[in-house]
Amino acid sequence: MRINPTTSSPGVSTLEEKNLGRIVQIIGPVLDVAFPPGKMPNIYNALVVKGRDTVGQQINVTCEVQQLLGNNRVRAVAMSATDGLMRGMEVIDTGAPLSVPVGGATLGRIFNVLGEPVDNLGPVDTRTTSPIHRSAPAFIQLDTKLSIFETGIKVVDLLAPYRRGGKIGLFGGAGVGKTVLIMELINNIAKAHGGVSVFGGVGERTREGNDLYMEMKESGVINEQNIAESKVALVYGQMNEPPGARMRVGLTALTMAEYFRDVNEQDVLLFIDNIFRFVQAGSEVSALLGRMPSAVGYQPTLSTEMGSLQERITSTKEGSITSIQAVYVPADDLTDPAPATTFAHLDATTVLSRGLAAKGIYPAVDPLDSTSTMLQPRIVGEEHYETAQRVKQTSQRYKELQDIIAILGLDELSEEDRLTVARARKIERFLSQPFFVAEVFTGSPGKYVGLAETIRGFQLILSGELDGLPEQAFYLVGNIDEATAKAMNLEVESKLKK
């Protein structure tokens, strides 16, 4: 792979001698291009098709070389629609991989996969660009410090804490709240952490991308008055884009994050919504290139593609990238090859449960399925670890007793088990929390709960001090003091009704 200098945009240095080819075949988003003998472009080189279609409209399509076919032909995947392209059209080899703008100029702006701004706010300074294909940092450059990344979300901080500079996966089926949780994390972290973030919208709904942009402007994460003061860069390759764009948009976002880490030596947050769509786009491209499908119809190169992206998301001695990735789980099946391959790369997994969402408990994080490598006494401390383990034990016991309750009813349980069930139901409700980004839906103001407050609250429930309070007092509150205040209000209301 040839890498162009960091301070040139694709094709600038090589367009003088113009290595030209011609389109010989078009199959949807895949083009076959013939080049003169001895002038074949490298794999991953960007090719540009310029010209006019049959009605005189200007065409400008960028493609990426994927295969060398022999007979001086290459197969390339288009990064935008191929409407209007015809056989015989001229194709320019830029001599370098796709390069995108990086650095402070990207903050507050929305880009497509090619690094072109799509927010109608004028051009972006492209003096500093970087190729989207790079190798992962060497072992010797990696940083191995362990520290907790506080999110202000009770269930996450207590039971599956995130690692600073780690990789976190949000697993869930359709409609259980992955994107809302990501938006809340962006909101909380931008306020409390103050670092820069890069958001990669990979194959998700355009409406959600627009909502996120509007919310970021409202909350000040994107500063409209002074765009350079913004804290986030957005890169979108949404559902309506061709598979080539959806497959590469994650790399575009990652390249921007790597610059902040390596050159600016900052701690960066990289949000990817949704990593499953990256796999899905790779599967589409693989089929279009004629590769034999593997398990469940996925591409045979699934592990390689996932590894090449994930291994670049890491912390070095210069700075860190903490990555939070939403992972769509097809048909709620965690053994599907796409989520199963993703699991191997993660430091923490937050699993969203349809059962909890159906009960109205949001965030619908499953306390028993969610895991973290950080939940160890030597990292989080004895108090945190003990509290988390007791919460899990109580929840597990409640889960075991549910069958008995369904058949025989609560009255058939022993006194001890009834107490466990009562506390587990309080814990289940106290794990819910009103979100800032969901205020418009719930009508409840959002709450940020510090880790110490979270631990104190669960210790009080487990100790039995709050056994006398009704369980609905613990639903959608912030810290434990709000729950006791809510219980008093409920008592007053019930007396007034009588």
Curated annotation (Swiss-Prot):
Give me the residues that bind ATP, please: 172-179
Write down the superkingdom of origin.
Eukaryota
Gene3D superfamilies referenced in this protein's UniProt entry, alphabetically:
2.40.10.170, Bovine Mitochondrial F1-atpase, Atp Synthase Beta Chain, Chain D, domain 3 (1.10.1140.10), P-loop containing nucleotide triphosphate hydrolases (3.40.50.300)
Membrane topology designation: Peripheral membrane protein
Q: Does the keyword ATP-binding apply?
A: yes
One Pfam match, given by its short name, reads ATP-synt_ab_N
Q: Where in the cell is it found?
A: Plastid, Chloroplast thylakoid membrane
Note the SS bond partners.
none
The EC number of this protein is: 7.1.2.2
Q: Give the signal peptide, or none.
A: none
Extract one GO molecular function annotation from the record: ATP hydrolysis activity
Is the keyword Nucleotidyltransferase in the record? no
- Tell me one GO biological process term: proton motive force-driven mitochondrial ATP synthesis
Gene Ontology CC annotation, any one: proton-transporting ATP synthase complex
Coarsely, its chief localization is plastid
The record ties this protein, via PROSITE patterns, to: ATPASE_ALPHA_BETA
Give the reactions, separated by semicolons, that this protein catalyses. Answer: ATP + H2O + 4 H(+)(in) = ADP + phosphate + 5 H(+)(out)
Q: Which PANTHER family match?
A: ATP SYNTHASE (PTHR15184), ATP SYNTHASE SUBUNIT BETA, MITOCHONDRIAL (PTHR15184:SF71)
Family assignment? Belongs to the ATPase alpha/beta chains family.
Q: What does this protein do?
A: Produces ATP from ADP in the presence of a proton gradient across the membrane. The catalytic sites are hosted primarily by the beta subunits.
Description of how the protein assembles with itself and partners: F-type ATPases have 2 components, CF(1) - the catalytic core - and CF(0) - the membrane proton channel. CF(1) has five subunits: alpha(3), beta(3), gamma(1), delta(1), epsilon(1). CF(0) has four main subunits: a(1), b(1), b'(1) and c(9-12).
- The name of this protein is ATP synthase subunit beta, chloroplastic
- What is the gene called? atpB
